[in-house]
C-alpha cells in the first residue's frame, strides 16, 4: 500500500539517472574551461602588444616587447618603466629557447623585426607572427 510516497526502487532509479547526467556534463565543462582560459590569455597577449604599440606613439618613446622562455612570460616596457607583465606558465608555454626583444618605434609604431613565436598548450599549438613594417601581427592556431 503506497500513500503519497515513492518506493526505494523508484528513488534509486531517479538518483542513478541524475548522477549519470551530472557526470556526463562535468567532463565537457572542464575542457571548455581550459579552452576559454587559452583564448582569454591569447586576447590578453594581443591587447598588451597593441598597448605597447599605442604607448610608443603616444608617449614618443620606443616600447619593447620581451618574451622570456625561462620565466615563461611576456613583458612590455619602455626605457623608464615596465608596462605589462603577463605570466604564461599555467596555460601556454613558449617553446623556443631564445626569442629576443621587439621594439616599437616611437615615430610611427612600426616594429623593428619580423619573427614567429611558437606557443603550446595542452591541446593546441599557436603561432604569434610579427610582420615587418607597421607593427602588424596575428595569432594562428595549428
Where are these regions (language model features)?
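N-terminal single-pass transmembrane signal-anchor helix
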Residues: 1-29
